[in-house]
Structures are given as C-alpha cells and as structure tokens.
Swiss-Prot record:
Gene3D superfamilies with a match to the protein in the record: arginine biosynthesis bifunctional protein suprefamily, ArgJ beta chain, C-terminal domain, L-amino peptidase D-ALA esterase/amidase
Upper taxonomic lineage: Eukaryota, Fungi, Dikarya, Basidiomycota, Agaricomycotina
Name of the featured protein: Arginine biosynthesis bifunctional protein ArgJ, mitochondrial
Family affiliation: Belongs to the ArgJ family.
Transit peptide interval: 1-9
Quaternary assembly: Heterodimer of an alpha and a beta chain.
Originating organism: Laccaria bicolor (strain S238N-H82 / ATCC MYA-4686) (Bicoloured deceiver)
C-alpha cells in the first residue's frame, strides 16, 4: 500500500492523529476495480493544509454509453451541486460520464454564485471528456464541507484542468480519489468487489465519506417526497456492467433505502447528501434491464444493496467520537416501513446513544424510543395500528458469538445478569434486537446501524463549523 497519513480534520482541516481502531478499515491494494474508469484526487487549495487532497475527478472512459443514477438529500436547503446534478440527470434521461467532487466547502446556501460555481465545475470537467453530440453536459458534481461559504472557484477550476495529468486507473488513483472526499473522516472509505450474473464477470467499486451530520433520507432525482427529517454523506458507486438508466435508478433507490438511509451518527440530515452510481458497460456483458431479464436485474440489485451496505457501515464506524458500532434490528412489525421508522428512532435517541457510550444496558430507553413512533395505518383496512406491549421482546446480541442476553420477553422483564450485560456492552460491536411480535412477515423487519454519543463528539462539533 502506498504511504499515506490519514487525519481527522478540524474546522480548518488541520491534521490530527487517527484512532487506532480505524486502521483495519483502511483500504488495501486490490485489482478488482471496474474497467473503463480513470480518476484522481489532488490538492486544489480548498483545504488550507498543503498536500491534502480536496478535489476528485472520476471519468468513464468506456466506449459504451454510461448510465447514471442518483439519490439526493430531501433537505429543503438543497445545495447547489445537488440542484445542478439533478438537472443534468433530468435533461440527459439518466446518462452521464463523469463525477467531480470537492471537499472543504459545501457550496450550500450560497445563492446564485453557488449555482454558477457548480455549473462551472460541470463545464470544466466536461472539457476532459470527448464531446457529446447528444448531451450538453455529462458531469455530476458533489461538494462537502462548511455551509454558507463560497467556493474558491478559480482554484477548483485550475485543479480540474490540471487533473488530466494525473488521471489513472490503478489502486493509487482510486485511493487518492477517495481521500479527496474526506472532511472529518479519519480514513478513506473505498471498497471493491467482483460478482457474476449469468456467467459474466463484473466489477463494482465505490467510495464514500461521512463522519458527522449523518442521518440521510435520500430519494431519486426529481421525485422528492419528504418524510421525516434525518458532515454530509457523499458516495459514488461505479460498475463495468451495462445497466439501463431506469433499472440503475430503481436498483440504487432500493439499495440506498436499505443502506445509506439506514444509518445515523447524530440524527442531522445534510444539505448535500448524495449517492451516485455509474454503469459503463466496459465488461461487455449483456444489458441488465428489469423489463427484459428480471432475474439478472434482481441479482444486480442484491449485489448493489450488499455493496452499498458495506460502504454505509464504514460511515458509522468512523462516526465522530464513536466508540461503538451497533446494529439495531426491528422484527415483527406490520410493514418494512414501520420497522424502519422504529429502528431509526432507536438509533437517533440521544438517551439510547449516551447509554451505549456509558456501556449501560438501559433497555427502558429502547422501549421508550420504540413506543414513540406511530405505526402506519393497516394496509388492508386503513385502521390505525398500535404496538401491543405484551408482545414485545428485547435482546442484546454480542458480536463475539457468545450467548445473547434477553432483557424483555413478551412484555415481561427478565432478571438480568448485570455482569453479563456489561460484558456485551463493552464490546465495540453488538446488536439490539427488538421483536414487536405483530407479524411473521419477513417484510416486517428492518436494520439500522448507529454509534454512541461520546464527549469527543461534542468536542469535535464544538470546534468544527459545519
């Protein structure tokens, strides 16, 4: 692996040592990256510290058309790059060949100047691609960092032009591109995998960033339907499979709901949350389309969902000040959405999260959070539904393979072995399992991933202007 120093950045993005627990999440050299992409990460000057990557350029070099999909924040204050990328996708009908990302400045709540700057980034990156006779613009843009400040756009545009000299497809290029996503992250989040569909081998790789201001609630482009509101989460997933634009968007929407929309660090939704997917067909396999080959599409959707889940979990593991990685599973709900809403509420409860930091198996806080979420009306009768407390069970499940610890069974509290409870709570990874006992339907189950609230989280966010 190439030599690199990974830091936790403050409000001025000065270097600080990373925690030792993050070392085993740092990406290792891999040859399983998708074909037909060239990328780089460079220092353009957005961040004050010299040499720290803050600009990433990703190009599809495939001779085949490249489909693109996106899920964006539902925050009312959508940043300029979100609005611009949404417009590019809408005009192109789901085709794009490049992504440009800057870190250190979010270009959010920046008015007309912010929109002009985002479009300037698109046009500068378009210039690195062969001209398209069909599309005016071929680039999607992402930004992350401080809200309410204008981009140093001249530095960024110079960086985009200069990036042409360092574009590559080797591991170092992927690694540098992932580093350029980082703000308060302590390590670059980069993963890749190989998968097969109908005998054809494909590759998928992706990078994301996020450690604070994490509670995404993203939806597909141009179809925002706000639900409850949830530093920014950005992600880009690339594959050399050929996937139709509609199928790529449908698969990404499904995957994001069960991965990035199922994580929380602090319960705050960003203005910039964005996940992009590109499929360039460079592996020369048949087109994956849900209308013509449902089976192949379902395999691809599962691969994408599993991969997105891996990336999303890295964000929680790198949560600002986090000492715990906790899976919250809710089962036996009337619907997936009910289970998801309850798991979300548990995962964002400040009382639950502080108990996790204090290594206190305080299941009363878990129940209180669960019971505060109204269930959706019955899908068959439309009648309101309520949780039956006499059917609810809560169990703590350790990650080390030892015995689970039930603390509530069918509404009746167990005599809890406090020593055993403490053993589980001191683990870095464990699971909170809540069974509502209202349904046996597997669709009534959802998972969420969260972390604890520590003193360090308060210190970081007292120092960092988001």
């Amino acid at each position: 692996m190439s030599s690199l120093v990974l830091k936790r950045f403050s409000s001025t993005f000065t270097a600080k040592p990373i925690p030792s627990k993050a070392h085993h999440h740092i990406p290792l050299p891999s040859s399983s990256f998708p074909s037909g992409y060239a990328l780089t990460g460079i220092h353009a000057g957005v961040k004050k510290q010299a040499g720290v990557p803050d600009l990433s350029v990703i190009l599809s070099t495939s001779e085949h058309p490249t489909s693109a999909a996106a899920c964006f924040t539902r925050n009312a204050f959508k940043a300029a790059p979100v609005l611009v990328s949404d417009e590019v996708l809408k005009k192109n009908g789901g085709w794009a060949k490049a992504v440009v990302v800057n870190s250190g400045c979010a270009n959010a709540v920046t008015g007309k100047q912010g929109m002009d700057d985002a479009w300037a980034m698109v046009k500068a990156t378009d210039a690195l691609l062969p001209p398209s006779a069909k599309f005016e613009h071929q680039t999607l843009v992402m930004s992350t960092g401080v809200i309410g400040q204008n981009l140093p756009i001249s530095k960024i545009l110079s960086g985009i032009r200069e990036s042409k000299e360092t574009l590559n497809s080797d591991f170092s290029a992927w690694e540098r591109a992932a580093q350029a996503f980082m703000t308060t992250d302590t390590f670059p989040k980069l993963r890749s995998r190989v998968f097969k569909i109908n005998g054809f081998e494909y590759r998928m790789a992706g990078m994301d960033k996020g450690a604070g201001m994490i509670h995404p609630n993203m939806g597909p482009a141009t179809t925002f339907k706000p639900k409850q509101l949830h530093a920014t989460l950005l992600g880009c997933i690339l594959t050399d499979a050929a996937v139709s634009p509609k199928s790529l968007q449908d698969a990404l929407t499904y995957a994001v709901d069960r991965s990035f929309n199922s994580i929380s660090v602090d319960g705050d939704m960003s203005t910039n949350d964005s996940i992009y997917a590109l499929a360039n067909g460079a592996a020369k396999g048949p087109l994956i389309d849900e209308e013509t080959d449902k089976e192949a599409y379902e395999v691809f959707k599962k691969e994408l969902t599993d991969f997105a889940t891996d990336l999303a979990q890295l964000v929680v593991r790198d949560g600002e000040g986090a000492t715990k990685f906790v899976t919250v599973t809710v089962k036996g709900a009337p619907s997936y959405r009910d289970a998801h809403n309850i798991a979300s509420r548990i995962s964002t409860s400040a009382l639950v999260k502080t108990a996790l930091y204090g290594e206190d198996a305080n299941w009363g806080r878990i129940l209180a959070a669960s019971g505060s979420v109204p269930l959706l009306p019955s899908s068959s009768t439309g009648e309101p539904l309520t949780i039956d407390p006499t059917k609810v069970s809560v169990t703590f499940i350790p990650s080390d393979g030892t015995s689970p610890l039930p603390v509530l069974v069918n509404g009746e509290p167990e005599v809890v072995d406090e020593v055993r409870a403490k053993e589980i709570m001191t683990l870095e990874d464990f699971e909170i399992f809540v069974n509502l006992g209202m349904s046996d339907d597997p669709e009534g189950e959802a998972k969420y991933w969260t972390c604890d609230f520590s003193y360090e989280y308060v210190r970081i966010n007292g120092d960092y202007r988001s």
